Each structure stands twice: as structure tokens, then as C-alpha cells.
Amino acid sequence: LKVPDLPLPESYKKALELAKDDLAREIXI
């Protein structure tokens, strides 16, 4: 997942990290 190099709201960055964690868990990493 490519994260844009832009200033993002903390809530958005947190949601993005949670989404990546969920994705990794599903794949199974």
C-alpha cells in the first residue's frame, strides 16, 4: 500500500495503519 507523502490528519494515519494490520493478518503474514 503506497502512502502519499502528504501531511495527513492523525486519525487518517491511524486508520491507515489499522487497515494495513488487518490486511497483513488476512494474508497472513
Curated annotation (Swiss-Prot):
Q: Which UniProt keywords apply?
A: Neurotoxin, Secreted, Toxin
Tissues expressed in: Expressed by the venom gland.
What are the top taxonomic ranks of the organism?
Eukaryota, Metazoa, Ecdysozoa, Arthropoda, Myriapoda
Task: Give the molecular function GO annotations.
Answer: toxin activity
Any keyword Secreted?
A: yes
Q: Does the keyword Secreted apply?
A: yes
Give the protein's recorded name: Scolopendra 8011.73 Da toxin
Q: Where in the cell is it found?
A: Secreted
**What domain of life does the native source organism fall in?**
Eukaryota
Family note: Belongs to the scolopendra toxin 8 family.
User: GO cellular component terms?
Assistant: extracellular region
> What is the source species?
Scolopendra viridicornis nigra
